Amino acid sequence: MSNINLATLDISEHPNLPSSSAVLFEAKAKKKLSFEAIASAIGRNEVATAAIFYGQAKASAEDIVKLSEVLGIDHLYLESLLSGFPDRGKSMTFPPKDPLIYRLFEIVQNYGYAYKAVMNEKFGDGIMSAISFSTKVEKETDLDGNNWAVVTWRGKWLPYSRF
């Protein structure tokens, strides 16, 4: 287990995150758990689980119970931290400063209109939902041994209403 890469949090670099983030990340580090392990234990997708840690997704009552058990955090305390609604989108500056997050922003900046055009041709006038939405990250290794990140976005298509 000592060879595992773990995402941690320096809360001083992220002052806009909710107080729950520091508590969750501290317990995660103490238990030496990856998001994949935590997600498996609570029955959620690892990106959705990480979003709870960053205050960008709502934890269900069942999530809170399971997170409490997995991370060893008092249930009532964790419930008090996570029972509200997320204040999404305030956790970082814009454009993002972190290189990986900036590259995700850059992908949308560079290919956004191309995505839009292709989606409009396939589905008509509308948008892809980020609410009726799921995402996942997978790792692929090619024949030369190079690692590739495979990010999948799956959003419900919402046609614009005519009125």
Swiss-Prot record:
| Active site location | R103, E106, S129
Under the heading InterPro entries, the entry gives:
Cyanase (IPR008076), Cyanate_lyase_C (IPR003712), Cyanate_lyase_C_sf (IPR036581), Lambda_DNA-bd_dom_sf (IPR010982)
Please give the catalytic activity noted in the UniProt record: cyanate + hydrogencarbonate + 3 H(+) = NH4(+) + 2 CO2
Q: Name one GO biological process term.
A: cyanate metabolic process
Return the CDD domains for the record: Cyanase_C
Which GO MF terms does the UniProt record name?
Answer: cyanate hydratase activity; DNA binding
Q: Print the keywords alphabetically.
A: Lyase
Q: Which EC numbers characterise this protein's activity in its record? A: 4.2.1.104
Gene3D superfamilies from the xrefs? Cyanate lyase, C-terminal domain, lambda repressor-like DNA-binding domains
Task: Summarize the protein's role.
Answer: Catalyzes the reaction of cyanate with bicarbonate to produce ammonia and carbon dioxide.
UniProt family annotation: Belongs to the cyanase family.
HAMAP family referenced in this protein's UniProt entry, alphabetically: Cyanate_hydrat
User: This chain belongs to which protein, by name?
Assistant: Cyanate hydratase
What is the species listed in this Swiss-Prot or TrEMBL entry? Paracoccidioides brasiliensis (strain Pb18)
